Amino acid sequence: MTKDRLVTIDYCRILAANFLLFFAFYLILPVLPFYLTEVFNANNATVGIILSCYTIAALCIRPFSGYLLDTLSRKPLYLIAYFIFTAIFAGYLLAGILSLFIMLRIVHGLAFGMVTVAGNTIVIDITPSSRRGEAVGYYGLMNNTAMSIGPMVGLFMHETCSFNTIFICSLTSGVLGFIMACLVRT
């Protein structure tokens, strides 16, 4: 008996899109506390609140994400969320005041919550039902791979580069991931 084919060009593209999304996220994650304290003179409590805004926003939108993905067309929602997620890195470059940075952080969390749910849903849609568990497992492995590389690269860059360079690298990773996401056929 032959197994249904898991590795297709579209599956590889969504794996790459997921890795690049999470790499962009994890690249700046360990650097943000330094950025907030050095650029905005934020104290530790403020840094904690700002970083939490992202996660709280992502958690708040996830239940609605599932409903929207079941009600509306999935790929456009995925691409819109991915685009917003990526564009926010450019916003970080331009945020000159802390209140604007906080608003961007909240929108970033909302986009992250939507794009991650949408990505998982699309993986399920484009893979054979007999191999969905395996497909989602490998898809999640891209998160873990980015988690193991991104913070290390981000902290190394913090020692050698400007904050703007780090944000531009996250933006570049997001743009490349968005291109991969656009190429996925559903």
What would you call each of these model-derived segments?
Residues 7-48:
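Helix-loop boundary and gating motifs at the non-cytosolic
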Residues 41, 73, 94-99:
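Helix-breaking motifs and short loop linkers at transmembrane-helix boundaries and internal kinks
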Residues 55-63, 147-148:
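Residue-level signature of mid-helix packing/kink "hotspots" within the transmembrane helices
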Residues 62-73:
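Helix-to-loop junctions at the C-terminal end of transmembrane segments
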Residues 76-90:
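Structural signature of the two symmetry-related core transmembrane helices
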Residues 99-107:
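Paired small-residue
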Residues 106-142:
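Cytoplasmic helix-loop-helix junction between adjacent transmembrane helices
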Residues 172-186:
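C-terminal membrane-cytosol helix-exit motif in multi-pass small-molecule transporters
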